[in-house]
Amino acid sequence: MENNFLTRSECSAMRGIAILAIMLHNYCHFIGRIVQENEYQFFVSNNQRLWQVLTHPDALLPVHLLSYFGHYGVPVFLFLSGFGLVMKYETPSPTPPREGGAFQFVKYHYLKLLRLLIVGFSIFLVVDVLVPGRFHFHWYNVIAQLLMYINVLPEPDKIIWPGIYWFFGLMIQLYIVYRLFLYRQKSIWVVALIVICWLLQVFCDPEGETLNRLRYNFIGGMLPFGLGILFARIPTLGLKCSHPGTKAVPRWEYIATLLLSTACIVTMSFWYHSWFFVPVFIIIGTVASVKLMPGWMLNIVTWIGSISAAMFVAHPIVRRLFITIAWKQDIYDGLMLYVLVTIAFSWVVKQLIDRIPKPKL
């Protein structure tokens, strides 16, 4: 089975876009007067504020948009994870990876995640102690974070700090689900699991704790993750989705796709039942963006994608130090310094991570 839907560089570019969105979102939404996102729960009040800033824009409109929409970088990562698992473990290759049992598979991916988590979390703990207003960690929550089961505990949004590290618990759950239920199984099972996870959420109170807890776990991430698996299993998709230059798809079709996706993302965000499917158009729009990028821009975001894992664990550390500039001085001054330092510090963190031996399957 051959799938040329996304090249390696395009996947890396999508990671670059995703981590930039997440990094900027996690700074902007900490500024008190900025519009808040609907990530785990659906608050009508947040949409009302979004509508207000869209209809009465001011100088802070980009910050509002990054705060509200930036978290959708997470579904892009989930899509790429599902896509990558199929390409690595289900696609014939001259040098196929070793196939261990389910326990070996989960252990291998847990250790890969732990390499990132242990570096970022350790540095963050030191910084958090030194900076005023530190978070009160409890030993049992630290253990839960390191073992990546903290997502299943009550009120995860109040015990996971920094908040973005919830992603590690989500990923280990999705690895378990993939290996036990979806690995080399018929694609109908992927579709069925997506539908089941949607049904478990759709009847919840939009602002309730039940929905919050579901979306902190694999149930909330199954849609983009499952789409990645499905897209990777379509062998002829790449024939219609080549990068511009192959002439397989006219450039105007990508432009139309990007514009339509953007319209759907904004419109569907205002209704509870359509809100669940916004990640679909986020993914489609991101793919279209990558396909449209000129070479020089693709090279930049591809490089950002190459350090995205390090940036993921590093940016909360930099935010902890620089968020006070946005609180006390100018928002854009703080944002610019935050971005520059985050990129530089992420490169340093990557060097530390690379010194830790990689696990073997």
Located regions from the model:
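Membrane-cytosol interface segments of multi-pass membrane proteins
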Residues: M1-C197, L239-V249, W327-L361
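Interfacial loop-to-helix transition and helix-capping segments at the boundaries
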Residues: S9, L61-V74, P156-L170, C204-L227, ...
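Aromatic-anchored segments of alpha-helical transmembrane domains
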Residues: L20-Y27, L146-V152, I194-E207, T257-F270, ...
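Hydrophobic alpha-helical segments of integral membrane proteins
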Residues: L85-V86, F124, Q201, D205, ...
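Hydrophobic alpha-helical transmembrane segments
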Residues: V127-V129, Y178-L182, C204-D205, T262-W271, ...
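Alpha-helical transmembrane segments of multi-pass integral membrane proteins
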Residues: F225, I255-P357
